[in-house]
Amino acid sequence: TWYVRNQNNQLIKQLKNATNNYFKNYTKTKSSENLWTTFKNYKTMIAGKGYAKGFLSSNTRATNEYRDRIAVAYLLNKYFNPCVKNFFTQNGVKVDDDAFAISEMLQFIWRSAIRDGEQVWLYIPSSRMRNLLIQWINNTSKIKMEELK
């Protein structure tokens, strides 16, 4: 993954600094209002003062504990596990990496205050993940507009 290739690289420090800047200078939120995720093995490399305690594993489900968080950083670019993908493919099941990725991201974002209809700040540094979210919003909006006709 990107993290493995760059773990001793300036890019990890850049991601940490950008995340720190997002929470401190852009959203200006308190630590208790922040929620963020990355791969668990890289959490300590990215964690920063003022948001470290807001870490939540990206695959956490069925919790309302973070519903008061208004600033979210999704520091992942998700793909199917290659072994799982190969298993499904070999058994005739089509796997859609993009559908999987947007589903995972939406599940994570849903842990925040957005579940109560509140506005939240989103930081998604991966252009792929950001574009998937924008496409999903646009497609969902089009469907709702069609229903109103």
Model-found features: residue ranges?
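Positively charged, amphipathic N-terminal segments that serve as targeting/anchoring signals
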Residues: 1-57, 71
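Conserved RecA-like P-loop NTPase helicase motor core
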Residues: 50-139, 145-147
